[in-house]
Design a protein with these regions (language model features):
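RNA pseudouridine synthases
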Residues: 1-322
Length: 322
């Protein structure tokens, strides 16, 4: 039997009782009609995909006003709507060897590649934040075996799923504001190592541009150059070539990146703009590889409580040096 014959198509017809946005109407009614929870992201994808008609006219605007008495029809491919792309996250449990620094206020760990920093839309998907909480809980219960509530761990910054390296969590809400300020005010200094192909033309350079999202919300998030007048935000990265080599007959370079700002996908976009995309970063023109070869190597900052300078380095994973 052909796959399309197995699709479950549902035609849902709605009438607005009062003025409401299209997105809000569907968020309320679609879960009721399908008898299951539907995330806001899935509702928006339905709209953006052209599955919704407002008074018989296709409507792709989630914010469109639906007047009282207006008719809305939705064609739902149930299987496609609830399909979750299988993830190939690694299985990971935080151990003492993954902890780069810890005191009563903060914990800094070495994040593995191919493991998300925090929880996403799939509730059952493991993540580093959950692993840190489990680690802290297990340690706390060694001295207090009857402890029932897991300890607090605050996310201060994030790394992309495929990026490895240094990441900081707080252990107390009281230091959150001070830690947030370290990153918001660019007091914390970060150094990344990347493997690119081909090598940048210059051994040292700084990339400066205004950045923003350049892909539609219905597609995977992609960032790039966006003029300031169009909402772009300033971003700068200092880049230097550490070494050059060869991989399967193709030239590669090992580069050090020092971001002065913290924009989404900043280093990936800046390296791609030099014609030297990161190995494995297919979204930005890189060659296919087992992972995106980007590693957060060093994080330096004054301690949020003692103000003593701290510099923490995560060892380079295999493949990041000659």
């Amino acid at each position: 039997m052909r796959a399309e014959n197995l699709r479950e198509l549902r035609d849902i017809k709605l009438t607005a009782a009062a003025p409401v946005s299209l997105n809000d109407l569907l968020r309320t009614e679609i879960p009721v009609r399908l008898c299951r929870e539907v995330s806001n992201g899935k509702i928006r994808r339905l709209i953006m995909a052209g599955a919704v008609r407002l008074d018989g006219v296709p409507c792709r605007n989630p914010s469109a006003l639906v007047r009282a008495g207006a008719s809305v029809s939705v064609r739902v491919d149930v299987g496609k709507l609830f399909y979750e792309k299988p993830v190939n996250d690694i299985a990971f449990e935080l151990t003492a060897r993954d902890v780069l620094y810890e005191d009563e206020y903060i914990i800094v760990v070495n994040k593995p590649a191919c493991f998300p920093t925090e929880a996403g839309m799939v509730a059952s998907r493991d993540n580093l934040h959950a692993a840190v909480v489990r680690y802290l809980f297990a340690n706390a219960r060694r001295s207090r075996p009857n402890l029932r509530n897991p300890p607090y761990a605050g996310i201060m910054h994030r790394l992309d799923r495929e990026t490895s390296g240094v990441i900081l969590f707080t252990k107390s809400r009281e230091v959150n504001a001070a830690c947030h300020a370290l990153f918001e005010e660019r007091v914390a200094q970060k150094t990344y190592r990347a493997v690119v192909s081909p090598a940048p033309r210059r051994m040292r350079c700084s990339v400066e541009m205004f950045m923003g999202r350049i892909s539609p919300k219905s597609q995977p998030a992609k960032w790039g150059a966006v003029a300031e007048r169009d909402g772009g935000v300033y971003a700068r990265t200092d880049i230097s070539v550490v070494a050059q080599g060869d991989l399967g007959g193709k030239p590669i370079a090992f580069v050090e990146c020092r971001p002065h700002t913290g924009r989404t996908h900043q280093i990936r976009v800046h390296l791609a703009s030099l014609g030297a995309p990161i190995l494995g970063d297919v979204l930005y023109g890189g060659q296919r590889y087992a992972r995106i070869m980007l590693h957060a190597q060093t994080l330096s900052f004054p301690h949020p409580v003692t103000h003593e300078p701290i510099s923490i380095t995560a060892p380079l994973p295999s493949g990041f040096d000659l």
